[in-house]
From Swiss-Prot:
Quaternary structure annotation from Swiss-Prot or TrEMBL: Part of the 50S ribosomal subunit.
Organism this protein belongs to: Bacteroides fragilis (strain ATCC 25285 / DSM 2151 / CCUG 4856 / JCM 11019 / LMG 10263 / NCTC 9343 / Onslow / VPI 2553 / EN-2)
Repeat is among the record's keywords: no
Gene3D superfamilies: 3.40.1370.10
Keywords linked to the UniProt accession: Ribonucleoprotein, Ribosomal protein, RNA-binding, rRNA-binding
Function: One of the primary rRNA binding proteins, this protein initially binds near the 5'-end of the 23S rRNA. It is important during the early stages of 50S assembly. It makes multiple contacts with different domains of the 23S rRNA in the assembled 50S subunit and ribosome.
Start and end residues of each stretch annotated as Disordered: 44-79
This protein's encoding gene: rplD
Top-level taxon: Bacteria
Alphabetical list of Pfam families matching this protein: Ribosomal_L4
Protein family: Belongs to the universal ribosomal protein uL4 family.
Name of the protein this chain belongs to: Large ribosomal subunit protein uL4
HAMAP family: Ribosomal_uL4_B
GO CC, one annotated term: ribosome
Gene Ontology MF: a single term: rRNA binding
């Protein structure tokens, strides 16, 4: 599959690049995508949730009423889970949600996500670029020139670029990632994926 190469002014350079079929043209594997996204989301969790059990509630331990003869249910102290303000039974406890995923599955998931974007014609390739200084205005102009300003945007760079990152940081729906940090969730969450020529070459080395 061939796509045109544009510059940041939105002009067609007259050159074309070929998207690797083994990355951008495979039959997407939805289960691999599910597993990779599940792992990504789980690993973002802090896992600090906590509720108090009966023994952790600060309150009197005096028995509310007599055990028998009251005509109602048996009750212990005010910390009982059946009463408002009492402890919680089997409530959440701090835990680590982190889990690992096989490298082959993660690679397949990223290939599948990129293939979905290629099928939707949602991949734009641009010449390598750099900003002289962090300027949000310059980044916005680039998105308008490429006609992607109205979409969620994922810009993939070959390596970290502070000026580009800072220029996009304050723009809603815009995300800048390096090729090493590319993940399935970010790709699927974007309406359009913008790849530089160097990023496209680097993807071949990482995902093949």
């Amino acid at each position: 599959m061939e796509v045109n190469v544009y510059n940041i002014k939105g002009e067609d350079t007259g050159r074309k690049v070929t998207l690797n079929e083994s990355i951008f043209g495979i039959e997407p594997n939805d289960h691999a995508i599910y597993l990779d996204v599940k792992q990504f989301m789980a690993n973002q969790r802090q896992g600090t949730h906590k509720s108090k059990e009966r023994s952790e509630i600060s309150g009197s331990t005096r028995k509310i009423g007599r055990q028998k003869g009251g005509g109602g249910a048996r009750r212990g102290d005010m910390n009982s889970p059946v009463l408002v303000g009492g402890g919680r039974v089997f409530g959440p406890k701090p835990r680590d949600y982190y889990f690992k995923l096989n490298k082959k599955v993660k690679t397949l998931a990223r290939k599948s996500a990129l293939s979905y974007k290629a099928q939707d014609n949602a991949i734009v390739v641009v010449e390598d670029f750099n900003f002289e200084a962090p300027k949000t205005k310059v980044f916005v102009e680039m998105t308008k020139n490429l006609k992607v300003s109205d979409k969620k945007l994922l810009v993939v760079l070959p390596e970290a670029n502070k000026n580009v990152y800072l220029s996009a940081r304050n723009i809603e729906g815009a995300n800048v990632q390096t090729i090493s940090g590319l993940n399935t969730y970010r790709v699927l969450n974007a309406g359009v994926v913008v790849l530089t020529e160097s990023s496209l070459k680097a993807i071949d080395n990482i995902l093949i």
